[in-house]
From Swiss-Prot:
UniProt name for this protein: F-box protein At1g48060
NCBIfam families xref list: F_box_assoc_1
Domain F-box: 20-69
CDD domains xref list: F-box_AtFBW1-like (cd22157)
Any Pfam family hit: F-box
Lineage, uppermost ranks: Eukaryota, Viridiplantae, Streptophyta, Embryophyta, Tracheophyta
InterPro entries according to UniProt: F-box-assoc_dom_typ3, F-box-assoc_interact_dom, F-box-like_dom_sf, F-box_dom
Organism: Arabidopsis thaliana
Length: 365
């Protein structure tokens, strides 16, 4: 081939590549709109394709968009396997009381279970992250990125400890809080995730000498919740159990009402009592076969079955509006799910733990 002919051929090939590249180019505003509609796991794949797409998915306005899409995440352990499932919350009108069936599962996977880890969590999902323990060493988990990050022991002298996870809305950082649970203390250790010195724990004084309540299986081991940057958890001071600005929901033998006590003023310790319709008004199974796992951002109580066998149901109750919604999720705990994962068809799924207001996050640990 002559040099001139070879040069012309190369120019033609370059034009074709340029034309092909331009035909595949997507304007940033359209790409952003598409990404905002996708689950986080799909966004991660696309962000690796082009640098300008990666700049979209790492922008604060984009990552914050996941906060408006809370989902129900649940997980359980079977032998040495760790199963994780995320399902969306259905779109329901405020006063709608109907049954829903959904076949949409946002994410479902299994991974080897972290060795020697305490399976019970003591904090809800906090801006997409969940905290575990491995003996006296905390473990932070990002379910979206499927990553576990072990942390150093906060204090070598502590024989046992409790860890909580919080989020600072001003600094936009997650913070792990640890304190001894076998003795009262007026100190805690705090580690800021993503900081330059991420492996360093700092000591912070508390207002009271106390220790977190160990709880039991009935009250889910004294869970903690982070609200507007403040941690609320069950604790004991002088043998009295205290709780922050929170609410106690009664499940006593009150047949005609469901009592709730709300701490209105933290400093004055003023409590208000509210009485709602009993659970049996909505569904008789709620009294004995379902358990309360949390509350939505809209104030709905969330109930799930004590034992999941073939059908996975979630009940949402708004005690103020007096509405009831039953949601049935297909593809979860049914025959197909069990066969695919080798879980057997004749035994219930046990030890399921729930995170009712989980949001996805692309945060790297």
């Amino acid at each position: 081939m002559k040099p001139q002919e070879e040069e012309e051929k190369n120019e033609n090939m370059a034009r074709k590549r340029s034309k092909s590249s331009s035909s595949l180019s997507i304007p940033l505003d359209i790409a952003t709109d598409i990404f905002l509609r996708l689950p986080a796991k799909s966004v991660v794949r696309f962000s690796c394709v082009a640098k300008h797409w990666s700049s979209i998915t790492t922008a604060p306005y984009f990552t914050n968009s996941f906060e408006t899409r809370p989902n129900l995440l649940f997980f359980f352990k079977e032998a040495d396997r760790f199963f994780v499932v995320t399902v969306p919350k259905p779109n329901r009108r405020p006063n709608e009381s109907v049954s829903h069936t959904s076949s949409q599962i946002l994410d479902s996977y299994q991974t080897p279970y972290p060795k020697h880890s305490c399976f019970t969590i003591k904090t809800e999902s906090v801006h997409g992250l969940i905290c575990f323990q491995r003996g006296t060493k905390p473990i932070v988990w990002n379910p979206t990125m499927r990553k576990f990050k072990p942390l150093r022991k906060p204090d070598k002298s502590w024989e046992s400890l409790t860890v909580f996870l919080g989020y600072d809305p001003l600094e936009r950082t997650h913070k792990v809080v640890a304190m001894p649970c076998d003795k009262a203390s007026d100190e805690c250790r705090i580690l800021t995730l993503g900081s330059a010195d991420q492996e360093s724990w700092r000591t912070v004084k508390t207002n009271y000498k106390h220790h977190p309540s160990r709880g039991n299986r009935k009250n889910n081991y004294g869970p903690c919740r982070c609200i507007n940057g403040v941690l609320y958890y069950l604790a004991e001071i002088d043998r009295h159990r205290l709780i922050g600005k929170f609410a106690f929901l009664g499940h006593s033998n009150v047949k005609n009402s469901l009592p709730m006590w709300v701490l209105e003023g933290e400093k004055k310790g003023e409590w208000s009592t509210y009485n709602f319709l009993p659970l049996s008004h909505y569904d008789r199974r709620l009294e004995f076969h379902f358990k309360l796992i949390g509350i939505t951002n809209d104030g709905e109580l969330i109930y799930v079955p004590n034992t999941v066998f073939k059908t996975f149901e979630v009940i949402y109750i708004d005690p103020i509006r007096k509405t009831f919604s039953l949601v049935k999720y297909e593809g979860v705990a049914d025959k197909g799910f069990r066969q695919r994962n080798g879980l057997g068809e004749d035994k219930p799924l046990r030890g399921i733990q729930y995170s009712p207001n989980h949001v996805e996050t692309l945060l790297s640990l």
